[in-house]
Amino acid sequence: EAIAAVSAAIRRNRVGISPKHKPVSFIFVGPTGVGKTELVKQLADDLFNAPESLIRLDMSEFMEKHSVSRIVGSPPGYVGYDEAGQLTEKIRRKPYSVVLFDEIEKAHPDVLNVLLQILDDGQITDAHGRKVNFENTVIVMTSNAGSDNKASGAVGFGGSADDQGKERIMKALQDFLRPEFLNRVDEIVCFNHLTKENFCGIARIML
């Protein structure tokens, strides 16, 4: 289901149905160990035929207000002004990339504001005044939001456990992401818990 949703969104962008000058964007939500990061790695390999086209930013390193300067570069007069931003410089040199923002719920709100501008305009200005175009990138954010609570079974008219899980995940995302942010994301992909059949299939592939 997750792979089908990602594939459909990529195809919509390729045929021109999605808005122009806007990168394809996803939020992968689910418990740890269900393959969110592995799918991102495979996506980078399949889209651009190069695993090194994946740019990964761990949001646990961007929890402070000043950490936003590490993305676009430090402003004039501050330490590190001569150094380019970790993200903007990589995209400027390699515009066809998959950008992974891992554990987005840990990011400082100012970092989310920068990301919102990228999702909205498809470009951002770095500390040196240069426009960096994200039109040809794929933006993926991962989160464990809503997955720490045990999914309760369907009772009465409550619907299926999967539907209840998706509702719980959406409520958890809304706790730290504003509506205008969520509305600019192409697809929110919910990863289900792995079943016994899934584990058997993974074991066969690895063996």
Please annotate each region the language model reported.
Residues 1-207:
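AAA+ P-loop NTPase nucleotide-binding core of proteostasis motors
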